[in-house]
């Protein structure tokens, strides 16, 4: 996923049948996907390696009883796959990653390694076969990873609290992974695997030094026995805050080094006529409103000594904005919150100039193109849209979408951000 903002997508049947250009390469849907949700090949002649990405179309948002169970399941599936094919687990699950909406397993090699890569990929869908002691010991590894992240970013806890207040929940779009660490069990992970790690909830992206014919042959060889079933539905897409919510919670804690507020706001972009265009417009719009608030509260103002922002979008037009603010000495958290709310309210789209839009557009086009220089970024972009079933896209292709994003849609998103909508703050 792109680190600047995270973009969340689900299926749209129209574009699953369309070929997408990737520089000189083509994103080709494989004709026979067998039981898989979808499969693509991306021939890249300039590369000597082959990358196979298995995208499980479920992640932490799909947890409904135990936060962190998707992460623990990822560990077991990755290590079991390694043990089955390589006869021993690799040192860690370095080839796997759990996000909010998906779990991605990546295996890389050259053409001589293709059968081994396919076996590793196929084995992820098999129920993890590891000793009971090994499976239980991996819970301690997950705990250490979570605690390490918490120590390095104490504000993660505050950000989780504000999302729990916004959605009135501890699961789905909100989570509580630290509190639930002692709830992790082998049985819960196997249950999660049995429900979500099915072919029809999985997508494969094969890229690099390979052609369509060979990719189809290998897909049939290793997944030809799979049967199509229903995909696991994303129930979190229906999880929204209460209309008119303005939750204000004051706490006292010694877990943070400085006084800090965490703010979350939920709003919507209702025009879903162009799903791909919506993401590009959002990329620019969020850059503009982030810049305005950063100028008012941090660069030009006397409110924040530290200010960070993030925005997320879902395919149904739901948008989530979060901000963390550490005020200057002498500025109370209550005053900082008032300044933040007033800065959002006063962001008038009539004052946003064509030049400002084009600067934001050019900046994001350049940023996205720069990611094309990194092989890792290419893989991230391939899986980005694929995280919920859409065809892969490259950094350069996404930069074209940004360049063509309509000004009208950009301003509509900013207007929706400014308008009154459900929010929560922790002071």
What are these regions (language model features)?
Residues 168, 199, 203-271:
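An aromatic/glycine/proline-enriched structural segment found at the starts
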Residues 203-209, 347, 351, 355-427:
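C-terminal regions of mature proteins
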Residues 90-192, 342, 354-376:
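Acidic/histidine-enriched segments that form metal/cofactor-coordinating
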């Amino acid at each position: 996923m792109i680190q600047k903002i995270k973009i969340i997508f689900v299926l749209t049947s129209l574009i699953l049948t369309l070929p997408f250009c990737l520089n000189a390469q083509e994103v080709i849907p494989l004709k026979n996907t067998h039981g898989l949700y979808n499969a693509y090949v991306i021939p890249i002649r300039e590369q000597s390696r082959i990358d196979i990405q298995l995208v499980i179309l479920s992640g932490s948002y799909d947890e409904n009883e135990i936060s962190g169970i998707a992460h623990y399941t990822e560990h077991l599936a990755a290590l079991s796959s390694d043990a089955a094919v390589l006869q021993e687990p690799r040192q860690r699950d370095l080839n796997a990653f759990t996000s909010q909406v998906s779990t991605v397993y990546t295996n890389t090699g050259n053409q001589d390694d293709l059968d081994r890569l396919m076996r590793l990929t196929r084995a992820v869908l098999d129920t993890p076969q590891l000793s009971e002691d090994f499976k239980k010991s991996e819970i301690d590894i997950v705990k250490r990873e979570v605690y390490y992240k918490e120590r390095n970013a104490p504000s993660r806890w505050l950000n989780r609290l504000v999302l729990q207040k916004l959605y009135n929940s501890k699961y789905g779009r909100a989570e509580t992974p630290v509190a639930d660490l002692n709830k992790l069990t082998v049985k819960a992970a196997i249950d999660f695997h049995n429900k979500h790690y099915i072919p029809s909830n999985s997508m494969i992206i094969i890229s690099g030094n390979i052609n369509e014919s060979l990719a189809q042959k290998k897909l049939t060889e290793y997944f030809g026995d799979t049967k199509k079933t229903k995909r696991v539905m994303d129930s979190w897409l229906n999880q929204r805050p209460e209309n008119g919510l303005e939750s204000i919670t004051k706490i006292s804690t010694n877990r943070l080094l400085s006084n800090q507020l965490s703010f979350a706001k939920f709003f919507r972009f209702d025009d879903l006529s162009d799903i791909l265009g919506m993401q590009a417009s959002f990329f620019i719009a969020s850059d503009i409103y982030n810049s305005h608030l950063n100028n008012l509260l941090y660069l030009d103002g006397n409110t924040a000594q530290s200010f960070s922002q993030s925005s997320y979008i879902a395919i149904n037009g739901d948008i989530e904005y979060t901000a963390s603010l550490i005020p200057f000495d002498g500025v109370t958290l209550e005053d900082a919150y008032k300044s933040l709310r007033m800065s959002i309210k006063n962001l008038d789209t009539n004052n946003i100039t064509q030049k400002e839009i084009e600067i934001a557009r050019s900046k994001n086009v350049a940023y996205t193109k720069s990611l094309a220089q990194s092989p890792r970024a290419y893989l991230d972009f391939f899986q980005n849209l694929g995280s919920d079933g859409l065809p892969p896209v490259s950094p350069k292709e996404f930069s074209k979408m940004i360049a063509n994003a309509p000004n009208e849609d950009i301003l509509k998103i900013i207007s929706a951000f400014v308008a009154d909508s459900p929010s929560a703050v922790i002071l």
